[in-house]
Amino acid sequence: MAVIGIDLGTTNSCVAVMEGGDAKAIENSEGARTTPSIVAFTDSERLVGDPAKRQATTNAKNTIYASKRLIGRRYQDVKDIKSSYEVVSAKNGDAWIKVLGKEYSPSQIGAFVLEKMKETAERHLGHKVEKAVITVPAYFNDAQRQATKDAGKIAGLDVIRIINEPTAAALAYGLNKSDKQKVIAVYDLGGGTFDVSILEIADGVFEVKATNGDTMLGGEDFDHAIMDYLMDDFKKTTGIDLHNDAMAVQRIKEASEKAKIELSNRMETDINLPFISSDSTGPKHLSLKLTRAKFENLVDDLIQRTIEPCKKALKDAGISADKIDEVVLVGGMTRVPKVIQKVKEFFGREPHKGVNPDEVVAIGAAIQGSILAGDVRDVLLLDVTPLSLGIETLGGVFTPLIERNTTIPTKKSQVFSTAEDGQTAVTIKVYQGERKMAADNKLLGQFSLEGIPSAPRGMPQIEVTFDIDANGIVHVSAKDKASGKEQAIKIQSSGGLSDDEIQRMIKEAEQKAGEDEKRKKFIELKNNGENLVHSTEKSLNEYGDKIPNSDRLEIENAIRDVRDALGNSDVESVDILQQKVDHLMKVSMKLGEALYGNANNTSSTESTTTNNNNEEDSKVVDSDYQEIDKKDGK
């Protein structure tokens, strides 16, 4: 069974699969190979992708976009993020999203998008899909990776590997290339995150030497730069502040994104938003010409922010920019001319443009899926952990055990002991990050080692092992060195979803899938009902005088019943609607029977007349023939 590759992006998502030795991105039900990572809620249904995006202007508060920026993050870290929807703090301190009175974890929102990707693949392949490789930004920490894996689980997928986006892109770029050893840089500027990875490719071995990035830098920030400029200009011109007008902000967001895209190919673009607001003097319109030069000026600091991670990645890899053989551009934002120019200036070479920046990550994930399934051989992928892993030691200092850019999977052990006489439990706090003080890094969890035999301080020898798997996810174990027995460890995660929460969300997803199927059936039935009413009324107007009044009245009553049932938007009324439609279909057949009956009678009459005429004609001919014979006989 095929293993699909999914690029779960901030702005757009993509799914790919290996077919006949080649990986290809799959078109969704709307005919596009990328799907907006947008989820919207109405009183009656949930929308994903393009349908959600199309209604965003009129339903801004209930339309969720860029939720990837919240996944695996604490509320305190993201409370200042600009969004049209409400971000709240969950019980465990994580950032969740509140819509129509209900709270959703970012993993759930991601799962809705993954379900769409799963359905897209299943429609293309013609069978169920269970296994997937999902990509994440290289600079995602453990909590963000685990939350992404949870999203896959909620969506009904067995996520067999989490792979870094730049690494996936390198895999798609370098597979089947016969070149000798190459050192490449993957510059990945997407909708919400930025990553840069330095890789060495040789004889089918893809080895990541170093990675760096910024998980809060991407196309969303470019959009906001334009949005702020437009709203500030509008306020100066009219005195009206649009920041608190959700519908206006959504319209400006869409216009800003469109302008950003157009300015990649044009030197200027017009932004026109009529009736964006009003005051006592009447309606107000937002109309402005945005040049590429002005746009580049607005986002120059954002583009410049990508350079420092590039410098750090090169330093960690131990090479200089002039030693890079190829620079591969990934992510939709790398179409911006100023970005291309900045990359060229920094690396001193023209970037490689032979890959589709929107699809290459998903294609790489599909290739990795085939490698894990054993379908693609002689390819080895060696990735690294993007952040250091360590513990809090005396004075709140962060002591790394596994340094950043260590090849994964990896394992390292450290022996700990007690700080006081007779101590029978020790709490160890595990952090991930690069700051010197533990509190400034990401707390992954704390370990309570209980049941330690009472002894003088410093005597117990407890070996704690930190293990980072191929997904970049951290695992911890511990044992008492004196006895060799494993000790019980209670891990109290600082956040994330519990197993019970994940199972609840899986059940909700399954239930929602059933509801979605019922709604789909309901909508199809309503369409059929409306078409039946229209065609029956048309036939009744044209041929109603050809049937008995009792039949006509019965058909009119059936039409009225269907029309009344169509006015009910409750999905649970699908059975009632089905009965009404079936009844109308049955009684309307009387109209058809009458029409065809009349047609047959007319046809029969015409046939009889024709036959009689033929007989008379035959007699005339015979008579003439006989007369001719008589003449010939004379």
Swiss-Prot record:
Task: Please give the coiled-coil regions recorded for this protein.
Answer: none
Q: Which UniProt keywords apply?
A: ATP-binding, Chaperone, Nucleotide-binding, Phosphoprotein, Stress response
What are the start and end residues of every segment in region (Disordered)? 597-634
Specify residue ranges for compositional bias: Low complexity: 600-613
Q: Does the keyword Mitochondrion apply?
A: no
Q: Which GO terms describe its molecular function?
A: ATP binding; ATP-dependent protein folding chaperone; unfolded protein binding
Q: Where is the composition biased (Basic and acidic residues)?
A: 616-634
One Pfam family cited in the UniProt record for this chain:
HSP70
- InterPro entries (UniProt xref): ATPase_NBD, Chaperone_DnaK, Heat_shock_70_CS, HSP70_C_sf, HSP70_peptide-bd_sf, Hsp_70_fam
Q: Which residues carry this modification: Phosphothreonine?
A: 193
Protein family according to the UniProt entry: Belongs to the heat shock protein 70 family.
Q: What does this protein do?
A: Acts as a chaperone.
Query: What protein does this entry describe?
Result: Chaperone protein DnaK
Q: Which organism is it from?
A: Ehrlichia canis (strain Jake)
Higher taxonomy: Bacteria, Pseudomonadati, Pseudomonadota, Alphaproteobacteria, Rickettsiales
